[in-house]
Design a protein with these regions (language model features):
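AAA+ P-loop NTPase catalytic core and its hallmark functional loops
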Residues: 1-158
Length: 158
């Protein structure tokens, strides 16, 4: 993950009615500036009100949100489009067979420092996402390997 410093808390409030186009008096926390992890806005995207409000509640109260549905129905895209309008960083992790516990947690890596090789811990996506305000989307959840799912379950329970 990038070493770019992310804002730690939303610094503005936006109108849900103006931003998402449906009746609501809710204001949602958002970021005034984009960074490299903010998805691109699809101006033609149509939001489902109930799903959008659930996602916004997750952002507002730092809660995990589970969105389920058939393959290809736009679950991940919905989260990304909400995040895009809030300038909220969003990272999608595909849980296919190529992801490992090391990718999630981190690993020791050999790096050069002052002309010498040293071993340094490089954190994975989970420690990084816990330390930063990020929407972490686990895609293809049912395809995750048991060892990977064990790590994710521990995070979801915390």
């Amino acid at each position: 993950m990038s070493s770019q410093q992310l804002l730690q808390k939303p610094d503005i409030k936006i109108s849900v009615k103006q931003t998402f186009g449906f009746e609501s008096g809710m204001k949602a926390g958002a970021f005034s500036k984009k960074n490299e992890y903010v998805p691109k806005i699809d101006p033609n995207y149509k939001f489902d009100k109930d799903t959008t409000l659930a996602i916004l509640a997750g952002f507002s109260f730092n809660k995990r949100v589970l969105i389920q549905g058939y393959h290809g129905t736009g679950k991940s895209t919905h989260i990304e489009q909400v995040a895009a309008r809030l300038n909220w960083p969003c990272v999608r992790v595909n849980l296919d067979s190529h992801i490992s516990r090391i990718d999630l947690i981190g690993k020791d890596a050999i790096v050069l420092k002052d002309g010498k090789q040293i071993t340094e811990f490089k954190e994975g996506i989970l420690p990084w996402s816990i330390q930063n305000p990020v929407a972490l989307v686990f895609d293809e959840y049912d395809a995750g390997r048991p060892d990977v799912m064990f790590v994710i379950q521990r995070v979801l329970e915390s």
